Amino acid sequence: FACGKGGNAVHFIMEHEQMSYPEALKYLAKKYGIEIKERELSSEEKIAQSERESLFIVNNFARDYFQNILKNHVDGQSIGMAYFRSRGFRDDIIEKFQLGYCTESHDALAQEALKKGYKKDYLVKTGLCYETDDHRLRDRFWGRVIFPVHTLSGKVVAFGGRVLAGATKGVKVKYVNSPESEIYHKSNELYGIYFAKQAIVKQDRCFLVEGYTDVISMHQSGIENVVASSGTALTPGQIRMIHRFTNNMTVLYDGDAAGIKSIRGIDTVSYTH
């Protein structure tokens, strides 16, 4: 690869699309019109593939649920949409990034998912819900506006949720993100990469910003070759993903202590990779 890491196209797809080896082969074969002869999957491979697909299906349900709440629920309009409007986001941008809202009810998503037949186990494994000590299911993102995180191919792999000042009492953590899972490895994902990849190639440059709203604001301003590391120091995996499309990166972090520390971290990672 241009970033200097060894490997082949299959391994690259496996790493950055979070696919198994058979899934990556099928993806590339379909993309380039190559016919492949398939062998019968082992029982273990079938189970693993089925589980990964199930986790993505549950994430798709959650994305649609959060979007529907934002558009049609009274709290979605008065709290969630009001926040996005305060940031100046247009309807087309809200739709493009599939933004949503989760009500302050602690188990509304969980109850709706169970009612529609989604398994409790998958709700927990995706990180959408967690189980309390008394075995009740609770929504991880209650009372927050929702930012879906997409893979390079556009699959919803995780979510970020921001609490709104004054809207949810007693909550001190501003952002909550999906935990690591079978399909989500934070160090290999960049927020906005699915929407930015074509512009990055066209402009031969990637702008790196800190957060979800930074990416969305720049898209709305017509600058689409932008991604975010979503509050973490840039990792080798994220550097490799950017280098897949360009060797030119401009960092637009805040000038505070945290931003300066992150920039120094980028220097170290870039030098070693």
What are these regions (language model features)?
Residues 1-121, 125, 130, 144, ...:
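Non-catalytic accessory segments of DNA primases and related replication-initiation nucleases
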Residues 13, 229-231, 253-255:
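Short beta->alpha connector loops at strand-helix junctions that form conserved
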Residues 43, 98, 232-233, 256:
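Conserved beta-strand edge residues that scaffold enzyme active sites
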Residues 47-57, 61-62, 103-249, 262-263:
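Phosphate-handling DNA/RNA-contact segment within nucleic-acid enzymes
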Residues 68-70, 98, 185, 202-204, ...:
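A generic structural signal for short
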Residues 213, 255-257:
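Active-site-proximal loop/turn and secondary-structure-junction residues that shape catalytic pockets
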Residues 268-269:
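Acidic, proline/serine/threonine- and glycine-rich low-complexity intrinsically disordered segments
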Residues 272-273:
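Conserved small/polar residues in nucleotide/adenosyl-binding loops
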